[in-house]
């Protein structure tokens, strides 16, 4: 039995980049021709010229908030705001809703969300039974996991959420080998089983998502005899990255291209620096190009010890949307980026807001190697020009600012 889901996982860098150079122009062209919204966004782009990650990074970023606005504007004529390249009917068996609401299409394709790869890495194998405890109501999480389980040859018990006693009875009767759902609900099941004296020790492995699973909780699961793995997936994009037995970050899925950009911009940051996760899908059905997730992450250096050769990320590290109201004016990360672009000598910057309610103090902290004379004054003028607010400028040596992805830090007292 193969240790890998397919041969794509162990490609050389050269093989992967060659495949990407062929896939990107085709995907851009498909998006332009079959997705009305992406066609408008990419109308001035020559698809044939987008053959690498470098060229991809020059395309505009579409953020989730924009997707929601376009969907609202297009309803009821177009539920998906012009982003889907598939229409209602046999090819779209379901439509799901996520908070917003944002509507997402289901597609009649094997393992549409590509979760099978994460299932395989978590040790799920053909012939096993998966206890699927994601909600089957309105949102796609349960169907994402179920389609992935089917892709690796598993059967699924559609448990959903709640009704803990009935779920424990079903586990005791059916003896599933695996669990999929949130980590918090798995803990509830295990604790309730202990209290009730119900044997559910058949569950030896789990694939969890939807919320954080810190090391302390993973250790607790291990002590209960359950080997838990995490995956990072969204309703819009499907599987983005997944955990392996190496337990070193998350390996990026083969069906997406991942970039880490400075929040509020489309500019890639150096490997290891925290920024916003931007994803391009290679799906012909829902072709999202440079989709800003609003989540923070960072590239993890090196390759996975398991032999999976794709890029790795550190996982979910918070939210990138740091828009803050200062003295009645909204200031967003893109404005800070605009200020930084005016000064080549500035390496990184962070806007820190302090003070108490109605007495906001704004300080722009910038890193510069050898700040020239007059830099503070010129940056101060740029701050006033861009934000229409006055603030203090503080110049720091390179490496002084924390590597946590924050561009705007709200340190005000709200007592």
Question: What are these language model-derived features?
Answer:
Residues 31, 98, 130, 179, ...:
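Residue-level signal for inorganic ion chemistry
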Residues 176-185, 228, 249-257, 411-415:
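A polyampholytic, Gly/Pro-enriched intrinsically disordered region
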Residues 179, 282-389, 405:
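AMP-binding/adenylate-forming catalytic core of the ANL superfamily
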